[in-house]
Amino acid sequence: MDVPTRTDPPYVPIRTSRWAPHQKAPRWLLLAGALIVVGIVLVALVHKPSHAQQAGDLKSFLTDVNSDIESCSGGVRESFQALHRVQAGANSANNVQDTISIARYGASNCSPANNEQLDDLTQYQVTESLAGYHLDTAVNDVVTWAFPYAQRVQNDVANELGARDAARRQQYAAALQRDTNDLNRQRAAIDRILNKAITATGAKASPPNLAG
């Protein structure tokens, strides 16, 4: 008599560990996060600069910028004064040569590569209390006023006085007029930014005295 073959059901291991429920963030952790956000907002409000602080910081800023640009600006002013003396009749060979030397030196001094103060200005960091007044743009514009505009103007002075004939002298005089116009437009752009900041903060100050 044949004995029927026994067929057992497939073996399924019994799970010994529990299914991990979905973990929710503890309430205290959510509360701590909310408190941190509130704290950040309160700190920002507490440290919002007053008009008095902004006015003081702006005066310091203008003093710094004026100090860094004044040697270049002074050279431009001196070059124009010497040129006007020559054009007014003090045109001896010595005076002409002196004016050329003044202008060449001034042009060199308006390059950040040759002027440590101007080089400092290229790396100037505006304080956070003055954020929003576009003073970074003003600083860059002052550097550009010096180099290349002020440098070009003084080289034009030297070139005009050193010209060997009337045609070249006229050519350099036209270049001087054109570059002086560029210099003055750049100064006007700087003054617009700085005067707006001065008015907004109530600072008792003026923009840098840029020659032109």
Report the location of each language-model feature.
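N-terminal intrinsically disordered, acidic low-complexity segments at the extreme N-terminus
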Residues: M1-R18
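Short, Lys/Arg-rich cytosolic juxtamembrane segment immediately N-terminal
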Residues: I14-L29, S50-H51
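Short, intrinsically disordered, low-complexity terminal segments
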Residues: S17, P49-A52, F147, E160
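Short, aromatic- and cysteine-enriched interfacial helices/patches
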Residues: R18-P21, L45-V46, P208-G212
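Intrinsically disordered, low-complexity regions enriched in polar/acidic and amide residues
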Residues: H22, A34, A52-Q53, A150
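Hydrophobic membrane-insertion alpha-helices, especially the h-region
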Residues: K24-V46
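C-terminal region of N-terminal signal peptides and the immediate post-cleavage residues
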Residues: G39-L62
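Alpha-helical segments in soluble extracytoplasmic regions
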Residues: D64-G212
